[in-house]
Amino acid sequence: MYGNKKRVFISFDIDHDEGTKTMLANQAKLADSCHISIKVNTSDTTLNIYYGDIFEQKGYTAISVNEYFDSELGEPVSEHTLHGMVIKKYFGGHPESFDSAVQTDLQNYSYEEVERTRGNKKKYSIGTTAKVTANEHKFLLFALSYTDIQTLKASSDLSTMIIALHGLFKRSRESTGGEKLNIPLIGSGISGVGLPATQLLQLIILSIIDETKKKQICKVIDLVLHKSRFDEIDLETIKRQWV
């Protein structure tokens, strides 16, 4: 009887080892499916796409905002958007310090003065990009969406997004100084471009490649996807299409 127990124990041990190997293999496979790299032809630019926290990356981080570069949390800027998170986390939630950083950088940019009951009154063109820093964190804030001055609701669409990306990449060429550019899944937030996550990603990839072929943006661009998009975006499919 003791021998039988011993054999059962050994058998369990072997199964456990095999299970561990399988688990590690699955984890390795998962890791591979969570990160891909695309080498842009005719350039030395590498585009990395992976899941992670956009705010933990080194280099410049692109954040979409509305055309007023609003700074008041709640309305018109939700603290749950990346725009709101920047104000809350890196400017202490203080509109004044955020406004000061933006206005200092955009002092030579043209704008339209608009009377609003709430929010900033300087309206900039879509694609206008402000380079701002908060301690060691560096941001490129670019105007992606229009704001209804009555409801304060932000909105965008496909053609507007393309114009906004062009403005972002133009400023990136001038400002990053060879440092990495980090880009989230632009257009997936409350601005509501109206495309599924995979199509948004494809559009951003295409825009980066097209702009890079015209003139290099920077050597390394990271497209950082939030983990909540894992079930929506199959990076293996993206890899087969672009790599």
Model-identified regions with their sequence ranges:
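Macrodomain-like recognition of ADP-ribose-binding/processing modules
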Residues: 1-243
